[in-house]
Structure formats: structure tokens, C-alpha cells
Amino acid sequence: MTILGTTFGMVFSLLQVVSGESGYAQNGDLEDAELDDYSFSCYSQLEVNGSQHSLTCAFEDPDVNTTNLEFEICGALVEVKCLSFRKLQEIYFIETKKFLLIGKSNICVKVGGKSLTCKKIDLTTIVKPEAPFDLSVIYREGANDFVVTFNTSHLQKKYVKVLMHDVAYRQEKDENKWMHVNLSSTKLTLLQRNLQPEAMYEIKVRSIPDHYFKGFWSEWSPSYYFRTPEINNSPGEMDPILLTISLLSFFSVALLVILACVLWKKRIKPIVWPSLPDHKKTLEHLCKKPRKNLNVSFNPESFLDCQIHRVDDIQARDEVEGFLQDTFPQQLEESKKQRLGGDVQSPSCPSEDVVITPESFERDSSLRCLAGNVSACDAPILSSSRSLDCRESGKNGPHVYQDLLLSLGTTNSTLPPPFSLQSGILTLNPVAQGQPILTSLGSNQEEAYVTMSSFYQNQ
């Protein structure tokens, strides 16, 4: 009996193990299955076999135990409520004409008739086109380009006819450096200048739905390989880079020439060739030998005989000369009229209007000295008081005039007398006009005079 009981126990245990592996799990095993991640993804392909559409789903986690798991679609179907998927290794698919393609369908993962997870999906938004085929590359020697052509089965379909294609090409040695070109047609032109010469290239293409239908990229088409030829420039052709540099250089030189012609006289010539003074004067200054023993002295004592005053303006000199030339004749005429009219003054007394003050005479003499008039500097400077007025004119007035004339005549007989004594009246000599000399009557007849001879001796 003991042996028989042990045998039945072993058989029962084996049946439990076999039933668990075959899918007849108990309640505890079902709870463990519910804890797994059964997320999945699906895509649809329209008109894959005539008018039939296909729907393919797969779990996102490849390690999921798919034993006893099944897919079911419900809603947006024609004539039926739900359809079950068929399993092919790790994927689940269904191929039928009963997809309505309007609205959303409910796709669920079930185990033992119980739904584990569900998704609502619109089949028109998960369309995956078929991969392009017949990819080829043709080189056109005359145009120096490559024409890429391919074909797709969607050109003859009713639903998904508008596609966007992605053409990818790379140099064979650059494994991860793909260059992509997107286009809606099935023809592409690659320029030879954009490719490396004598290089092997790999090219492939894929498609994605556009406009109404949305979805995923198709699988890549089989790769196509082509080689670029060597660049042989014909004798008449020129490198584009060299041509560009030549044109830029030509325009730059032309611009510089135009600017030089326009700005030559105003800007460039004064800097490059500055204007020089008259060549005759320049050569005279350069070639003329300096004179020797020049009578040039910077000794301050040489300038003691001639007082130097500052002249701030040329107008001051003109005013003084005009004053001396215009004022004195008028005053002399008035003096004559007064004398002839029998005024109170003595006949031998000169009018006060004729008398020149020492300050004005000094100023005029200094101006003439500055102008280089030696005769003006040599003129005697007379200073006296007017204490001897007209009351003493009858006694020593004529005598003073005669002494003055005698002293001037004895010191420098060559100079014309600046005054003429007519009837005891002192007047200006017309010859000496422009060189007025101050005369005044003074009580002291022993005044010092500076004559031309003493001036030359000092020099």
C-alpha cells in the first residue's frame, strides 16, 4: 500500500507540472501573468494582396512569454464584431477585406478569455508602406551627374498613393556619414561635383505615407552601389573656384583704377607728389652762397637810438600818416587866417593848433623808425616848455627860430630845413612834408639835439 500511494503521488505531481507548462495554469499563475508588461505596437498595410488589408502587432518587450496569449480586434469592421489574430513566431497578424478604415478599432491582448491590455487605434494613422524596389543609378557623362531611379508598388494602389521618399547615400568607407534627400517623385539627380571622384558609394531608399494617411517609414530598399569617375577637365573648361577668384580680382583692380582716376588731383597727388614752390626761388635759396661780413648785430645797444614800439595793426600806421598829411595843412591855413585877421595873438607867435605835442611826434617817429625811414629817425627831437608864450614873442621869439635854423644848418647842411621863417611865423617846409618835426618854444636855449651825424656815429 505504501508503494502504491507513493506512485500515485508522483504521477499527480507530474500532471500538475505538465498542465502548468501547457497553459492550464491555476489561479495563482494567472495572477502572475497579469503583473507582466504586455505593451504592444501595430501597423497596417493597405492593399497588400489585391483588395485585402493586413494588420500586424508585436510586443515591445521581446522577453515576454507569449504562451497562451492572443490578440483580438473589435469595432470598425464590416459584417463582423471581432476578429482574432494569427500567431507567426513572435508576431500576430490578420489579413482581411473587412476593415472599414473609418473610425477606431479596439485591439486587446487576452489570455484564457480574459483581457490583459487594450488599445484604441485608427488603422489609417498606422500605415506602413511597402519597401521601394528596382533601385538603380545611371551616370550621364555629358551632364556630369547621376540619375537615381526606383519603383514602388503604391503607384498602382487606390488608397496610399502619395508617399514621401527618403534617399540616403554615403561613401562606402564612411559607415555612419549618411546624406539624405527627401522627394515625392521616384527620380533623383546627383551632381558629380558634389561627390568625391573615384569613390564607391552606397545608396538606398524608403517611403512614408503623406497627406491623408499617416504612419511609419517603410523598410529600406536593397542597397545599390556605384562608382564615381575620375575628373578630367577639358582644355576649354576652367575650375569654378579659379574662375571666381579671377573675376573678383579683375573687378577689384578696375575699382582701384577708377578711384585713382577720380581722386588723383584732390587726394592722391598732394600726398604722393606734394606741391613745391617756384623752382627758380628754390634753386636760388639752395645754390646762393651766403654773404660774408654781414652788418648784422643783435647787441641791444644798437637799438637804443631808435625807440621800438609795438604796432598791433597796420591801420594804426595808416591813421597816423593820414593825420600828419591832412591835419597839419588845415591847421596852418587856420593859423594864417588868424594872423591876417589881426587876432589878439602876437604876429611872431605860432598858433597853438600848429604846435605838435611831444607824444604825437614821438609816436610818429617810432613808427617811421620801424618802417625803415632813416630820415625820420634822424630828425631832431625838441622838448621845451611853453613857459615862453606870446608875451615874450617880441623879445626872443624870432631869435629862437633863427637859432634853431642855424643849429640845423650847421649840423647838417645837406638836409632841407623843415621850417621856413616868414615874418616871424613858423611854417612847415613843403619839401619836408611827411617828416613832421616837433618845435616848441622854450626858455632854455641850451637844449640837446640829436643830429644825423651823431646818429651815424653811434651806428
Curated annotation (Swiss-Prot):
The protein, known as: Interleukin-7 receptor subunit alpha
One Gene Ontology term from the biological process aspect of the record: positive regulation of receptor signaling pathway via JAK-STAT
Signal peptide as annotated in the record: 1-20
Similarity-based family: Belongs to the type I cytokine receptor family. Type 4 subfamily.
Record's comment describing the protein's domains: The WSXWS motif appears to be necessary for proper protein folding and thereby efficient intracellular transport and cell-surface receptor binding. The box 1 motif is required for JAK interaction and/or activation.
A Pfam family the protein falls into: fn3
Disulfide bond recorded as keyword: yes
Entry GO CC: external side of plasma membrane
Annotated GO MF terms: cytokine receptor activity
KW ATP-binding (keyword) present: no
Chief localisation class: membrane
Modified residues (Phosphothreonine): T282
Membrane topology note: Single-pass type I membrane protein
Glycosylation sites recorded in the entry for this protein: N49, N65, N182
Residue positions of motif Box 1 motif: 272-280
PROSITE patterns assigned to the protein according to its UniProt record, in alphabetical order: FN3 (PS50853), HEMATOPO_REC_S_F1 (PS01355)
Compartment(s): Cell membrane
Motif (WSXWS motif): 217-221
Annotated Fibronectin type-III domain residues: 131-231
Alphabetized UniProt keyword annotations: Cell membrane, Disulfide bond, Glycoprotein, Membrane, Phosphoprotein, Receptor, Signal, Transmembrane, Transmembrane helix, Ubl conjugation
Membrane-crossing residue ranges in chain numbering: 241-261
Disulfide bonds: C42-C57, C74-C82, C108-C118
